[in-house]
Amino acid sequence: MTAPLIALVAARARNGVIGKDGALPWRLKSDLALFKATTFGKPVIMGRKTWDSLPKRPLPGRLNVVLSRSGDFEPQHAVVCETLGEALAISREHAEEDGMAEVCVIGGTAIFEMALPRAKRLYLTEVDADVEGDAYFPALNEADWTEVRREEHPAGEGDDYAFVYRVLERN
């Protein structure tokens, strides 16, 4: 079996915003269902701020790996790593043991920036809105990626905005 690949899972607005004040700047129930379906059973790697933003910790049914340089950070039911390399090694080993083909990096900005050059797949929700925020998804060169799946979702009950769910694979 080949080593589990690295996948980024993110939702961004048209202006690149992924967060504001430690939270998502929109309500997209349909996208949360896609997030759960995409990540369930797989290791998820996140930064400390993303961990702190989770309404329920840890994310159930997934190995939660948190990147933090704070020596006194000891969350219950999560693995803490100081480097992305360490987090990826632990996550890939866990994914292999469970027969999973990928590990998921779920944010925030700094973690996405570190992981993007190593990622082979992106699960990218593109929210049809320009919103205020203080966290952004890194610049993405679309020429490096091929879209393999696309789903359009209208705004509606539980979804503040229309969005497009895309799966991209590195060329």
Residue positions per predicted region:
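Enzymes that bind and transform nitrogen-containing heteroaromatic metabolites
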Residues: 2-171
